[in-house]
A protein has these predicted regions:
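Short, surface-exposed secondary-structure boundary micro-motifs
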Residues: 9-11, 62, 115
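Conserved beta-strand elements of the Class I
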Residues: 129-130, 224
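Histidine-anchored nucleotide/phosphate-binding helix
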Residues: 140-150
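A short, basic/flexible loop-to-alpha-helix module at the beginning of a structural domain
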Residues: 114-126
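Short, conserved phosphate/pyrophosphate- and ester-handling motifs at nucleotide-, phospho-/glycolipid
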Residues: 54, 137, 228
Length: 261
């Protein structure tokens, strides 16, 4: 059985925020769906944690193994409410997520290190954006969208979010509210396995395919993709080979499964 780990090229840029180890305290736990938990973490008060929207942290477990989760909060939120939010999906049999869904309590202290990852918005570009997420791959996209709104970045952005069932799109209402305030945001929810009782009338099928259906040419776009490796890999190969997306205009964080030790 598996928990989730994020794989990403490290930032080598000199301006990248410094990586630090720190204790974090569980501030609040909230179930967003039957198998996704929002975990609010409080950071050490004396310790300014700098990161870029889209980056992730790693928990260091007692046995030394690590679990990586994208930060769903944009950095500017720290100024008013120090702390970060993570979206953790339950992988039954996974040591860490079983703990999160079974035993984790408010005030518990965890060890973390970060920030890591190169999944942050390239702000020197004004190209229109496609954000592609599957499942909890939405977490860093939430941070990117919040950051864009805060910074007044008006680049057109099309968000495609895929889940098996409608309830897997756990921040659907939040996105619709944001879109009302961000006229440049287009939101396309996609469900791959809708059941009759879901009464789903929206787009169906695979989320990476919905982008292929909507865009004949991605040569002038940038794509940011996060989620299951099959989604990210299918998107990368098909957009570059069939939709003229330049290879260097595809940015991704893929969740890969790591067997629990």
């Amino acid at each position: 059985h598996t928990d989730v780990v994020l794989e990403s090229r490290q930032v080598t840029d000199a301006s990248a925020p410094p990586i630090k180890k720190m204790p974090v305290r569980v501030g609040a736990l909230e179930k967003l769906s039957h198998d996704v938990m929002r975990v609010q973490l409080q950071l050490p008060a004396n310790n300014v944690f700098k990161y870029l929207a889209g980056q992730y942290i790693e928990f260091i477990l007692r046995d030394g193994s690590r679990r990586a989760y994208s930060i769903a909060t944009a950095p500017h939120v720290q100024e008013t409410a120090p702390g970060i939010e993570l979206h953790i999906r339950h992988m039954p049999g996974g040591l860490f997520t079983d703990h999160v869904f079974g035993a984790l309590k408010e005030k518990e202290i965890l060890r973390a290190e970060g920030p890591f990852g190169s999944f942050f918005l390239r702000e020197d570009s004004d190209k229109p954006l496609v954000f592609l997420a599957s499942g909890t791959g939405f977490a860093p996209i939430q941070a990117l969208l919040t950051h864009m709104q805060h910074q007044g970045i008006t680049r057109p952005v099309s968000l495609y979010w895929g889940g098996r069932r409608p309830e897997d799109l756990y921040s659907d209402a939040w996105i619709k509210e944001l879109a009302a305030r961000m006229p440049q945001l287009t939101y396309v929810p996609v469900v791959s396995d809708a059941q009759p009782e879901d009464n789903w009338t929206g787009r169906t099928g695979y989320v990476h395919q919905a982008v292929l259906d909507d865009f004949a040419d991605l040569s002038g776009h940038e794509v940011y993709a996060c989620g299951a490796p099959i989604v990210v890999d299918s998107a990368r190969s098909s957009y570059i080979s069939q939709r003229m997306l330049p290879e260097e205009a595809f940015f991704a964080d893929a969740f890969t499964s790591a067997a629990d030790k």
